[in-house]
Regions:
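Glycosyltransferase catalytic domains, chiefly GT-A lineage
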Residues: 1-223
Length: 223
């Protein structure tokens, strides 16, 4: 089990924290968001010696060993990518709107990305994953292409990785598989414990309200 972090004297490369081995992120000039996404979007660059990787967001805890057994079985089936279906949405365009209405992204960052998707002819309701739990054969050539393109779009447009993944599945003609059956997500699975993010400070809440207000004024692009 590996945890990727920026360079730190307190947790040097190769040190252990419980079952986790600390590995430094090989990205020199990234901000906190980019550092956190590097290993997630580009596992083939940091785990070349392994055939399969499992990405788990820091707000998820596996609480039943049966899940490990199920994952081993799924990996043995030979599929290249497993994810978890979004519990509510099935469309990048709808998720973009939600990001704007909840101040998770700014209109100026989302607008060019949506314009790009529309000019590409990307369809509505093509699908959506949560992206907080991913199992993939990251060294497979098609998965490498998807992940490299994923990082490129993430770096070019908004820092919301959900707004580009299913476009890449569509672009590459790739069909991922589900970790859980339809209707089961990280929020209701008995195998996982979902930990809500920390409460925002008053200053951050005010800032987000201003961003939300600005976004609402500019939402015509998504209509």
């Amino acid at each position: 089990m590996f945890s990727y972090k920026p360079p730190s004297k307190c947790q040097p490369e190769g040190s252990k924290v419980g079952q986790w081995t600390i590995c430094q992120i090989p990205l020199k000039d990234g901000n906190n968001i980019e550092l956190s996404r590097y290993a997630k979007l580009l596992p083939h660059r940091v785990l070349q010696q392994y055939e399969v990787s499992i990405w788990l967001d820091s707000n998820l805890i596996i609480r039943d060993t049966i899940l490990y057994e199920q994952l081993i079985k799924k990996i043995g089936e030979g599929y290249k990518w497993y994810g978890i279906k979004h519990p509510i949405l099935d469309c990048i365009y709808d998720d973009a709107r939600k990001c704007l209405l909840t101040a998770k992204a700014r209109y100026k960052d989302v607008k060019p990305q949506i314009y790009f998707l529309k000019t590409e002819g990307y369809p509505h309701h093509f699908g959506l994953f949560e992206n907080n739990f991913i199992v993939r054969r990251h060294n497979d050539h098609i998965i490498k292409k998807i992940d490299e393109n994923w990082w490129q779009l993430f770096s070019t447009y908004s820092k919301r990785d959900q707004l580009s993944l299913f476009y890449l599945f569509w672009k590459h003609g790739f069909s991922p598989k589900l970790i859980f059956p339809n209707g089961e997500s990280t929020h209701n699975s008995r195998f996982l414990k979902f930990i809500p993010h920390k409460q925002l400070s008053i200053k951050k809440k005010i800032k987000n309200k201003l961003i939300e207000y600005q976004n609402r004024l500019m939402l015509k692009i998504l209509d």
